[in-house]
Amino acid sequence: EHADNLGEELIAICVHILSHLPGIVDGKICVLTDDKGAASKIDSAVKRTNVQNRGAKIILFSTPKVVQHMFQEQIEISENEMVNIISQGTSGNIVVMGTTAYDFDINVSISMPSEALVGKIMEPNGINIIF
């Protein structure tokens, strides 16, 4: 169902179980989703877990955040490839949560075309994508 959150809860349970496997260190498990609602539900399910039962820390990435992370880690990727990855599955502007050079607070709806977003990602101090 579109209105329920069963899928997100199941993902959270699976991620929680995986985070307890031997050899799993913080940041080894990454959930990639562009659904801000799903990410929020997964995050809150993990945070609701008692501290002693949490397991390894999980990373939640959106597609634009993955592209920014790849660029920052100097993974060989062209500008056209970045635009192609970011624009997959969407039409129109890309909406991200983040900060730009002179922001004091997190802006939850930075909206721009994928080409402009890639330009900001490549620009020093252009944008810090949170999700």
Where in the sequence are the language-model features?
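Active-site-proximal, substrate-binding regions of enzyme catalytic domains
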Residues: 1-29, 36-131
